């Protein structure tokens, strides 16, 4: 098993509201990233699911995905930045930079700690886990993030 971590991204220069980017880039970024409310304990690299719909401010609330808890799956993306304790930016798809150690072409899954792993989660006897592929390694440090929204249930 090879564990890899998501690198923190400073998205202030890449947000859709930034006037330095053109309309095409703005539209692309709207599909790749979204701002969300998250728990203070959530960290960069945690895969998350939508836990409640849009607030009046147009912000989703996300919570950590746990393969042992079916109601928290599937994950829709990964936290790539936190602008405050409870405000985060989630990347939903596209190229993602990690800490390295990945094998190009290998599939990557959500681990039991909501982080990235190169093997599916293993259920204990009489346990169920939801196995979700979230991307494919493009290189040692790059993952093509594209969460499978139809994960598989594994039985122990």
Regions found by a protein language model. Give the residues of each.
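Glycine-anchored, exposed beta-strand/edge motif detector
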Residues: 2-8, 13-156
């Amino acid at each position: 098993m090879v564990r890899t971590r998501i690198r923190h991204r400073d998205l202030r220069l890449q947000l859709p509201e930034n006037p330095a980017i053109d309309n095409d880039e703005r539209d692309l970024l709207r599909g790749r990233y979204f701002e969300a409310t998250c728990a203070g304990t959530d960290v960069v690299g945690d895969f998350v699911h939508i836990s409640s719909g849009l607030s009046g401010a147009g912000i989703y609330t996300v919570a950590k995905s746990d393969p042992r808890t079916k109601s928290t799956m599937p994950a829709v993306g990964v936290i790539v930045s936190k602008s405050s304790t409870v405000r985060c930016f989630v990347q939903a798809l596209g190229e993602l930079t990690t800490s390295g150690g990945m094998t190009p072409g290998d599939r990557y899954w959500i681990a039991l700690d909501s982080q990235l792993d190169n093997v599916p989660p293993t259920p204990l006897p009489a346990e169920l886990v939801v196995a979700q592929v979230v991307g494919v390694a493009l290189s040692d440090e790059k993952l093509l993030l594209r969460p499978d929204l139809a994960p598989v249930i594994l039985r122990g």
